[in-house]
Swiss-Prot record:
SUPFAM superfamilies: YhbC-like, C-terminal domain, YhbC-like, N-terminal domain. Belongs to the RimP family. Residues 184-203 are annotated as: Disordered. NCBIfam families: PRK00092.2-5. This is Ribosome maturation factor RimP. Pfam families: DUF150_C (PF17384), RimP_N (PF02576). CDD domains: YlxS_C. One of its GO terms (cellular component) is cytosol. It comes from the Bacteria. Required for maturation of 30S ribosomal subunits. Keywords: Cytoplasm, Ribosome biogenesis. GO terms for biological process: ribosomal small subunit assembly; translation.
Amino acid sequence: MTDAPDHHPADAAEKRLITETGVAARVAQIVEPSLEGLGFRLVRVRVTGQNGCTVQIMAERPDGTMTVEDCESVSRTISPLLDVDDPIGRAYHLEISSPGIDRPLVRVGDFARWAGHEAKVELTVPLEGRKRFRGIIRAPEGESVRIDLPDAKEGTPASYDLRLRDIGEAHLVLTDALIRESLRRGSAPVEDEEGEGEAPTAH
C-alpha cells in the first residue's frame, strides 16, 4: 500500500533538480528548448562509450507517457540540431527513450507523484556520515523529502529528511507495486523488453 497521490498532469515548465555536467550538459542545453516546443520534458542526458559513443536522451510528456512514435518524433527533430552544433565532436549513436518504470527522479514533482514507492537516493554531501539511501520516499515538504528505511538496524534512524538541493541522483526501484501503478497510470514503457522504448540513430 502506498501513499502516492492519484496521477495528475505535471507542470510542463518545472525545472529539474538534477542536471548534467560536461558534454551531456551541452547536449541538454541544445535539445531542451525543442523538446519543450514539441510538448515533452527532458528527463536526463547521458553520453557513454557504448558502441563507440552513444548519446542517450530520456524524455516524457508532462503526464509521464512516452510512446515509440514519440521517441521517433523527438529523434527527427533534435538530430539535425545536434548535427549543427556538434557538441560530441565525433561519430555517435543517438538513443531517445522513455524514463522506464524504474525511472530517474529529477524534479520535485517526480518525488511527489511517486511518493510511497521505493527509491535509491544519492546525495552530493553526506548526511550523518552517509550519502546513499534506499527506502520509501514521501511527498516533499518545503525544501526536503523524507525517506523511510524499512530495513534500518536497531539503534539507527528509521527515516531521514533529505534536502532536495543536496540530491545528486535518485531513481525508483523496480517492484511489483511500482509495475502495477505504472500500468494503471499508463506511464509504463512500450515495446521494449528492457523497459525503455528507443529510437536509435547513427551519426
